[in-house]
A protein has these predicted regions:
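N-terminal signal peptide c-region/cleavage motif recognized by signal peptidases
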Residues: 11-15
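Small-residue packing motifs within transmembrane alpha-helices
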Residues: 6-9
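Soluble non-transmembrane domains of integral membrane proteins
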Residues: 18-158
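Positively charged n-region of N-terminal signal peptides that target proteins for export
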Residues: 1-4
């Protein structure tokens, strides 16, 4: 099975428009295309940040790496991905990688079949190593992306 590693170099930000990729893509840096929302109070929920009216609070990140320094804020990353493949293509396993191991809390949210965002993975340095979906130094997550469809991925970092 072939894999795509979507690398969030040192913690890549979220994007303003969908990033297109196809079966020939092997590495897709997202730092300059993701969007970031700083939640200073840490009170925003996935229902709030994924609502259309909330979209203007996200800012496009213009650097390769997100560097928030030492902060008590929660950071939400938003990544819009568009898997360019014929709708009849066989499902593939894609990987999202955060190449920045020192994160205390990290949550991945994906839409369910009704488009409602659900927590699909929770991990981080504050949790046991076994909490990682794929046991590797960087954080790796499988993404079930459907051929020919755009998907928005949310990451909550604290």
């Amino acid at each position: 099975m072939r894999y795509l590693v979507i690398v969030l170099l040192g913690l890549l930000p979220v994007l303003a428009r969908a990033v297109d990729f196809d079966d020939t893509t092997r590495h897709l840096p997202l730092g300059r295309v993701m969007q970031v929302y700083e939640d200073r109070e840490g009170s925003a929920s996935i229902a709030q940040v994924s609502a259309p009216l909330f979209a203007n609070r996200f800012r496009t990140h213009h650097e390769d790496v997100l560097n928030a320094g030492y902060s008590t804020s929660v950071f939400w990353l938003k990544v819009d991905l568009h898997y360019l493949a014929p709708a009849r293509s066989a499902p593939r396993q894609w990987l999202l990688e955060l190449a920045y191991p020192p994160l205390d809390h990290l949550e991945l949210y994906l839409p369910d079949s009704d488009g409602v965002y659900r927590l699909v993975q929770r991990t981080g340095d504050a949790l046991p190593y076994d909490s990682r979906q794929i046991r590797q130094n960087n954080y790796l997550f499988t993404l079930p992306l459907l051929p020919g469809q755009a998907t928005t991925v949310y990451l909550r970092l604290h």
